[in-house]
């Protein structure tokens, strides 16, 4: 308990916990309402909505692979730091949600190609920020710095990973519940279904933007602490450590 209290006093660790929770809340909230949105507003068939889900998930995978290339030892940070892409991924996800919001207000029946590019933007953003967050989590968990009156080694990496993993798990489950509840409430209160979904997507976009701001704050704190923190000393650098150098 004392170690957890000391960890929570660390501004960077606490802010990163908030970021993980907020970003994963927005990430999971969108998943269960995209298919009903396409069916209700665009009058898509079940087969078409399933195709849209495939487009979104494929785009997420592309974003993940792109981030893996950006953070690889071959690129070595020439395309920007991983923490920068963490912020950019959240902003891109917010833009994707806003685009879905606008598309619902100007929807035309059974226009499959109207949604696919928007889901591509959303999926790329999701893939970029999610893998960037994992990479940043690995880096921050191995930082060694004093917390309060404890020695630098008192707070173990496993405690940090456990805290952030718990935040991710709770947010992922809660996001699905809140996303569907918000859409049901909006549909009940508003006569126009497209407007109802637009409100929900706009709210999710705001959550992504909030996560982007938190990620930017984590990045700024991390940059300010360069040279004041350390990492476990190793005689050889593994490929994973070389990748983390790009963060």
Model regions and ranges:
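Juxtamembrane intracellular "pre-TM" segments in multi-pass secondary transporters
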Residues: 1-17, 41, 230-247
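C-terminal ends and interior cores of transmembrane alpha-helices
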Residues: 88-109
């Amino acid at each position: 308990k004392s170690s957890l209290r000391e960890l929570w006093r660390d501004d960077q660790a606490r802010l990163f916990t908030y970021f993980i929770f907020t970003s994963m809340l927005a990430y999971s909230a969108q998943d269960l309402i995209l298919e009903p949105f396409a069916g209700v507003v665009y009058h898509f068939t079940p087969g078409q909505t399933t195709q849209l889900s495939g487009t979104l998930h494929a785009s997420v995978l592309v974003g993940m692979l792109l981030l893996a290339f950006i953070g690889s030892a071959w690129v070595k940070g020439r395309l920007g730091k991983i923490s920068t892409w963490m912020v950019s991924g959240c902003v891109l996800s917010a833009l994707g949600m806003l685009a879905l919001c606008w598309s619902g207000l100007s929807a035309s029946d059974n226009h499959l190609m109207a949604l696919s590019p928007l889901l591509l933007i959303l999926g790329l953003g999701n893939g970029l920020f999610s893998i960037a967050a994992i990479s940043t989590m690995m880096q921050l968990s191995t930082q060694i710095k004093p917390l309060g009156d404890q020695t630098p080694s008192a707070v173990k990496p496993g405690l940090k990973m456990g805290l952030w993993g718990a935040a991710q798990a709770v947010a992922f489950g809660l996001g699905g519940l809140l996303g569907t509840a918000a859409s049901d409430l909006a549909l009940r209160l508003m006569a126009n279904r497209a407007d109802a979904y637009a409100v929900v997507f706009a709210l999710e976009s705001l959550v992504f933007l909030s996560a982007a701001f938190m990620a930017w704050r984590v990045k700024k704190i991390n940059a300010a602490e360069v040279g004041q923190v350390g990492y476990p000393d190793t005689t050889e650098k593994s490929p994973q450590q070389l990748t983390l150098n790009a963060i």
